[in-house]
Amino acid sequence: MKLEYIHIAGYKNLIDTTLVFETSENPITIIGNNGTGKSNLIEALLHVFVGLYYGKPPEFDYHIRYAAHNKQIEVRNSVHDGSYTVTVDGMPWSHAQFNRRVRSPQQMPPFPSQVFIYYSGTCDRVENIVKKYNRSYLYKLKNQSDDLERQFVFSDISQAEWILLGLIAHRHHALLIDLGIDDLHGVKLMLQPPESYVRDRDDPIYWGTEGGIREFLADLHNAADENYEPFAKYSGRSNREARVYRIGTVKLEKVGAVLEKRGANLYSMLQALAARQILVKNEFDIIQKGSRNHYRPESLSEGEKQLLCVIGGLTLAQNTECLVLLDEPDTHLNPAWSWRYNNLLKQALTSQQRTTSTTIIATHDPIMISGLTKEQVFIARKENERLIYESPVRDPRGQGVANILVSEYFGLPSSLDENTQMLLDERLQLAYKKERLTDEESARLSEINNQLDILGLSISFRDPAYKEFEEQKFAVLEGRV
């Protein structure tokens, strides 16, 4: 799906806020100071689409236009007037008609195939928004559905291990190479019966499950080394036996291949088992590339987990027509990964996914936007108690990080640190003073020059724009210009 226009008239500090999306390129980034509503915008969009899914609009006014599955959709919601109108391809649709089509994924719905969310801060706010969907998803699982894929995927750090297992199972090695991961060792999945299991009534292998979960349990049972072993200590329920499946990565890949034929993936299956409280725990060691050293997944850095949750999660979500909402997915990344982030996204999403989906990133990182066009960036700022989201004048691409920092994007007075900049400003004030310097001022100027001489290479080569400015200022004062 492609977002085209959104107007929000009153969600938290988003008062009369409008964004017009003028490019089909991904990602779209939102930058701005703290308090300019970047995270609130992500939440508001999530509220809108959860509301559309259930036919129950959120308690704020909005107007949205987007395209999905070859349809043009426009929705207006007014809390004050009590009006909620939906048009599809210019024709008004009843709420029942729209809701019916949205909930029927096989009918090319006027809705994203999937909404993928990553939120770097406290997750409670996002979890509360999708709480109703989580209940619906659990109901679907309990009713033995064959379709176990989530419409709203909320990826967070706690799921990094499932995503890593999924990447191995489906042979997506590009991100693993970046993370220095060669393979996994000693994979164990600890499972227990669902609450609905009755020992005297249900079969002991599949625990009375049906649909996609039963098929997946059969896949595990057939692939596991020596099938399975009882392991009661992993069970949280003393009256229900647990079991452990031990699966080598070769057999894990075979499970992945079987799931792919059914249009599923291991990540979504593990999510389904966890939702049914069948998956108790997973264990494995990571084999480091090159050295073959083993280490536990808990040893992964926060940045590595963040990459797994976003880039890895998107790699496994093979749907087209998606809405991807990422709130500060770069908080723990080193500069090298931030610099490569746009290409990592391209690596995760197929060309068709990029063409038919919208990815929105809220960020503070100048490196993240350094390779984008101006149409891919919104600058959030406050104006008369309103939040304005406007497009920049120049492309960030080609400017370099130092110039981006001092440009309209971030507006810093200098790309140098504050103390060095203060020394430069003081030197300029003394050097260009019209009156003769006092002995004390001359001594201070010499002291500053000595300090700056030590940093000479840093100033000359890391901030050439400032050096050029300083030389120009000297030339003007000397009458050479």
Residue ranges and their predicted role:
Residues 87-108, 305:
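Short linear interaction motifs
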Residues 9, 20-22, 67, 76-78, ...:
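A structural detector for beta-sheet-dominated domains
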Residues 1-64, 70, 263-412:
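Switch/communication elements of ASCE P-loop NTPase nucleotide-binding domains
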Residues 158, 165-305, 311-323:
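Extended helical coiled-coil dimerization/tether regions that scaffold
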Residues 29, 116-117:
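ABC nucleotide-binding domain signature
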Residues 70-94, 401, 407-408:
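Conserved nucleotide-sensing/catalytic segment adjacent to the nucleotide-binding pocket
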Residues 1, 22, 99-100, 106-116, ...:
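Acidic, Mg2+-coordinating catalytic modules of nucleic-acid enzymes
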Residues 68-69, 125:
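Globular "head" domains of long coiled-coil molecular machines
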